[in-house]
Amino acid sequence: MDKKAFELFIDNDKYTWGEDTITGAQLRVLGAIPEGVDIFLKVPGKPDKPIENTTSVNLKEHHGPARFSTQSPGSQAG
């Protein structure tokens, strides 16, 4: 039985993930995001949710691909 692959976006770059959950640490590896750069889960109609290395995101809960953005400390969200 094949596992479902989930599409997700990090700063508009498309990735595929083979598990139904992903952590902030796994997002860093997948998207080559350096430590010190903040990761946020974009939530339509709500403020973006900060994702720590230990935060787990359930990709099955999203309608369509999950969208993440990154932001260097001290910069304004875009």
State each model region's role.
Residues 1-78:
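Ubiquitin-like/PB1-type beta-grasp interaction modules and other compact soluble beta-rich domains
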